[in-house]
Amino acid sequence: MSIIPTRAAASDTGQRTPSGGRLGVGTMAGIGVLAGLSSAVLTLIGQARSATRSIEALAVEAALADGTLVPPAVPGGRAQQRLADHLVHVRLPQGDGVYSPDGTLLDPPPSQADVATDAPAPLTLVMLGDSTSVGYGTRSADELPGVILARGVAAATNRLVRMRSHGLTGARTSDLPRQLELCLADQPDIVVILIGGNDMRDMVPPWRSAALLGNAVATLTARGIPVVAGSCPDFGVITAIPQPLRSLLSGWSLRLAALQERAVVEAGGAAVALARLVSPQFVGNPEMFARDHFHPSGAGYGRAMAVLLPALISELDGRRTTGADQIAAAPDQLSA
């Protein structure tokens, strides 16, 4: 059915048929609007492709400079491993292990016999999610999100903390069930989830992405495992993305973040609004970004984890903090 009036349609309703001139103007106006929309869509698609190529080129250049570009993944890997070349081939710092209250990585990890009989067992912290959960953009293990949080929790609780990361660069929220299988095998005491950006890349509807996140959180909380989820950051602060695409992605990311936060809380987890609490601090501060100008740098991850850490400690204590409490407590927690 056409949305442009026709002579027959007007006559059938008993209305006066518009003149040929009026109909022509309306038709041409409609065509003009459609042409304008098509042009805008093509512009956005072109910007997306251009920005992606630029980010990938910078990532490869940085990896070559650091000596972290490695051969492709082993053939036969899971479908989730078939990612963009520069993501698959970049070797990330490794930080899984047991951390003491003074921040030392115990290597090798202590055996049960090495732990005093009256000492509490190590807490197990598991990281799930996408490239932000595994610290894509960092240059040393000390900058990894999981390591920062493990050391912070160990210092705050005066206990050993075992950190395991099952996140995957390029993962979408639909990958969480696979990650959960690995996570549950670790018998975690607390889980951190950072995910959502790749759902935007693949145009997964925000409500669907949030629902999948809520399901993952519910799977954990039903087992008595506390969960802290950092919601999607504001893509509007990433200047490597040109306008008007950046504004479009900003609105999408904020909508996704709001739905994620609601889903996490309804599932019994703690949601930390990174778009509100952290993203503004990236504006005008290029040192917060990695050399691909897209992912956070070590400093950027440090700022984000400073906001997440108080939420972890509160969840372990069976308490909840507000966003204001998180900001106020973060520096003290990290310097403890």
Set out the residue ranges of the language-model regions.
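A short helix->loop->beta-strand "cap" motif at the edges of active sites that frequently abuts
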Residues: 223-225
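Catalytic His-Asp segment of secreted/periplasmic serine-dependent ester chemistry enzymes
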Residues: 236-336
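N-terminal secretory targeting modules
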Residues: 1-124, 313-315, 321-336
